[in-house]
Amino acid sequence: MELFYHGTSALFKTFDMAHVLEGDGKAKFGYGIYVTEAYTSAAHYAYNKKRPENKSYYVYTLEIPDMTADNHLFSCRPVHPSIIQRTEKALGEQIPAEATTVGKYFRKYVGNKLTGKEGTIKKLISCADLDAEKSAAKFFCEIGLEYFAWPQAQTNPDGPTNRVVLNIDKIHIVRIDKVELDPKRFQLIEGSEEEVSLDSF
């Protein structure tokens, strides 16, 4: 298991997919629960631009499954051959090589195919609507993937990652901290972390 963090302005004991789009309302890196390796990033993400009236900010420390070579799609790396094989077997068709060059193309291509989208390969790998993202997340979870992953800094692809967890049943909440953010840039105010007991709400 790995320790990751999730920032939110909501207090809860379990994750619920019904609330997935209540953060920024986007699925830019896929559909699921967004987590990060950096506590300070999670704190920053706790500020909800869609609900600025929420003034309580929380960072959840989570245990999530270990990332292995063939249980995730990485946004800017080639897709593992095992994932391509499992996908082709489940879909009953061969995936074009262009769609396997990086994980984000593969995710979008599969989501678009699952939702009946048509067009050029370039179109199918470059954008996906919310229905396609939801379909891709469900499909990849069913064939054994745990994550969609991408680097926190695009300039450092081998550095810390952010991830989308596909199966909420694999997330274990270890700790919840209430944190304070500076009101201008919404960055963590160091030393403001205060643990919230799971029994207190």
Model-derived segments and spans:
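Active-site rim elements
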Residues: 32
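Active-site and NAD+-binding cores of ADP-ribose-processing enzymes
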Residues: 1-28, 36, 46-201
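A generic structural signal for short hydrophobic patches within well-formed alpha-helices
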Residues: 41-42
